[in-house]
């Protein structure tokens, strides 16, 4: 508690001269910056360490759902999406083999809840609907870092953390060892930073995950990225999901002239083999024909450089309970989902809101008290599930449907598109947007889609002729298989993410 009550000048001197703070945060990315800022706002002294402070150039972390915007504003960082040419996002447009349906974010009531959570859609104008935004990832991160640098309780240091420091007589983590560039010699020198609590948020490729959590993410595919210039989007201000003869494609504006295209390529598919031209061959032969005609010219131009597009692995890493021994692992290092639904930053900001509340000095006076920290982590684990569980389940389940590779999944895929086309959009998109946190509504909509898929498939199999009665047993068999597939896709992930 004493370190909180010292003067700002003394805290700054401790950080800059002695490399000591209440909290050491490793990683100045989406989670690390916001966590450092939230703790500093509570009077904590924070050291924020980052290996590379130049503007990052990444292809994910560019789409922020309305729930994430609300959390960012709650943290006092809403200004970070201003002045970076961010574009508003009002919902999604889904293309299914050329046919499209608009899925706008839902209308909400005075308490912020969607007005048609269980079914149907609202008809109000945009003034009653929340919006998200999309932007260049690097510009957004720079804004977050600038806010941290300007904060009187934060010292930001460019240094590469190489290992954690433990006590001689206990396993307690006391801080980190790093390598810092000496500007005079141009060589990296050994350095040390100490804190009552070390928060590690070093991203999807965390080098501390195995040490702290002993878990590994499951990688099912990669997103290959194109940046389309002056793309003629069919529905500006909306994310576009393309479902066709290619695996899912996601497009959204990241600036006035730039549109990001993320192309899902599962591992080992023959269409992207070297004999078929590799990833570029797959994009040219399968992705371009699946795109709406207005998008193709800019996509073709983006392929002209002859290079393999940049890629990122699409991973699933369920959350893990952890016991603090002076350090905790958070952000993408602890929990990931498929980025198709653009929910990663919304999850991160929600975690920061909850954890900063649980670690408030009124509740945890001494961040070195492992018992209090562990109690906070236990509560975080369960309190985050109503939002993060839903977003994680949706990400994995929708990817399974949109990347359908068998007859039952294709039936569910068509059922999902028809469900949206019938106007049942507000509930599902409110869950996706992070503004509806009720897992049972998610289950209701998923199995409503499943039973609609069963009905549509039965109508297709039986037909309208008199001989259709003889095909009825086939429709029954299909119904069982489709329902079974829906259960396999949904229930294990729902159980793991929301109830375990």
UniProtKB/Swiss-Prot annotation:
Induction: Expression is significantly lower when CYP51A or CYP51C are deleted. Keywords: Endoplasmic reticulum, FAD, Flavoprotein, Lipid biosynthesis, Lipid droplet, Lipid metabolism, Membrane, Microsome, Oxidoreductase, Steroid biosynthesis, Steroid metabolism, Sterol biosynthesis, Sterol metabolism, Transmembrane, Transmembrane helix. Pathway: Terpene metabolism; lanosterol biosynthesis; lanosterol from farnesyl diphosphate: step 2/3; Steroid metabolism; ergosterol biosynthesis. The keyword Repressor does not apply. FAD binds at residues 30-31, 50-51, 58, 145, 332, 345. The record marks 92 as: Important for enzyme activity. Its EC number is 1.14.14.17. It is found in: Microsome membrane; Endoplasmic reticulum membrane; Lipid droplet. The keyword Ion transport does not apply. It catalyses: squalene + reduced [NADPH--hemoprotein reductase] + O2 = (S)-2,3-epoxysqualene + oxidized [NADPH--hemoprotein reductase] + H2O + H(+). It is a multi-pass membrane protein. It comes from the Eukaryota. Its cofactor is FAD. InterPro entries: FAD-dep_OxRdtase, FAD/NAD-bd_sf, Squalene_epoxidase, Squalene_monox. PANTHER family: SQUALENE MONOOXYGENASE (PTHR10835:SF0). In Fusarium, the biosynthesis pathway of the sterol precursors leading to the prevalent sterol ergosterol differs from yeast. The ringsystem of lanosterol in S.cerevisiae is firstly demethylised in three enzymatic steps leading to the intermediate zymosterol and secondly a methyl group is added to zymosterol by the sterol 24-C-methyltransferase to form fecosterol. In Fusarium, lanosterol is firstly transmethylated by the sterol 24-C-methyltransferase leading to the intermediate eburicol and secondly demethylated in three steps to form fecosterol. Squalene epoxidase; part of the third module of ergosterol biosynthesis pathway that includes the late steps of the pathway. ERG1 catalyzes the epoxidation of squalene into 2,3-epoxysqualene. The third module or late pathway involves the ergosterol synthesis itself through consecutive reactions that mainly occur in the endoplasmic reticulum (ER) membrane. Firstly, the squalene synthase ERG9 catalyzes the condensation of 2 farnesyl pyrophosphate moieties to form squalene, which is the precursor of all steroids. Belongs to the squalene monooxygenase family. This is Squalene epoxidase ERG1.
């Amino acid at each position: 508690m004493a370190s909180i009550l010292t003067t700002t000048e003394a805290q700054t001197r401790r950080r800059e001269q002695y490399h000591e703070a209440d909290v050491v945060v490793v990683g100045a990315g989406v989670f690390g910056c916001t966590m450092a800022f939230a703790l500093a706002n509570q009077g904590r002294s924070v050291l924020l360490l980052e290996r590379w402070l130049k503007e990052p150039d990444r292809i994910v972390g560019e789409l922020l759902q309305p729930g994430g915007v609300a959390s960012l504003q709650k943290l006092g960082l809403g200004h970070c999406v201003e002045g970076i040419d961010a574009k508003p996002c009002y919902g999604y447009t889904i293309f299914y083999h050329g046919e499209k349906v608009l899925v706008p974010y839902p209308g909400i009531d005075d308490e912020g809840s969607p007005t048609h959570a269980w079914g149907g859609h609202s008809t109000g104008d945009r003034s009653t609907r929340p919006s998200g935004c999309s932007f260049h990832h690097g510009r957004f991160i720079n804004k977050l870092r600038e806010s941290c640098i300007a904060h009187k309780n934060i010292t930001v240091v460019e240094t590469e953390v190489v290992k954690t420091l433990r006590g001689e007589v206990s396993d307690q983590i006391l801080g980190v060892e790093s390598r810092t560039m000496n500007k005079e010699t141009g060589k990296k020198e050994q350095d040390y930073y100490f804190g009552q609590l070390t928060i590690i948020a070093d991203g999807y490729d965390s080098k501390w995950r195995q040490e702290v959590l002993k878990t590994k993410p499951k990688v099912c595919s990669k997103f290959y990225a194109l940046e389309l210039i002056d793309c003629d989007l069919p529905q500006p201000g909306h994310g576009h999901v393309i479902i066709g003869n290619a695996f899912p494609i996601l497009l959204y504006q990241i600036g006035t002239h730039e549109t990001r295209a993320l192309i899902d390529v599962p591992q080992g598919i023959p269409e992207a083999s070297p004999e078929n031209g590799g990833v570029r061959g797959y994009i040219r032969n399968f992705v371009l024909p699946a795109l709406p005609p207005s998008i193709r010219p800019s996509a073709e131009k983006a392929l002209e450089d002859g290079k393999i597009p940049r890629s990122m692995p699409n991973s699933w890493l369920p959350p893990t309970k952890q016991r603090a021994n002076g350090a905790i692992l958070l952000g993408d290092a602890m929990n990931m989902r498929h980025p198709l639904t653009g929910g990663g930053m919304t999850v991160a900001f929600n975690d920061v809101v909850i954890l900063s509340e649980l670690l408030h000095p009124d509740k945890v006076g001494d961040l070195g008290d492992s018992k209090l920290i562990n109690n906070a982590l236990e509560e975080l684990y369960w309190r985050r599930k109503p939002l993060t569980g839903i977003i994680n389940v949706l990400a994995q389940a929708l990817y399974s449907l949109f990347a359908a590779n068998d007859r039952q999944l294709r039936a569910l895929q068509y059922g999902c598109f028809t469900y949206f086309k019938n106007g049942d959009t507000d509930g599902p998109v409110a869950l996706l947007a992070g503004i509806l946190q009720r897992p049972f509504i998610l289950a209701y909509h998923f199995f409503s889609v499943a039973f609609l898929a069963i009905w549509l498939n039965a109508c297709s199999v039986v037909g309208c002729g008199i001989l259709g009665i003889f095909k009825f047993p086939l429709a029954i068999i299909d119904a069982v298989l489709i329902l079974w597939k829906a259960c396999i896709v949904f229930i294990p992930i729902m159980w793991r993410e929301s109830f375990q």
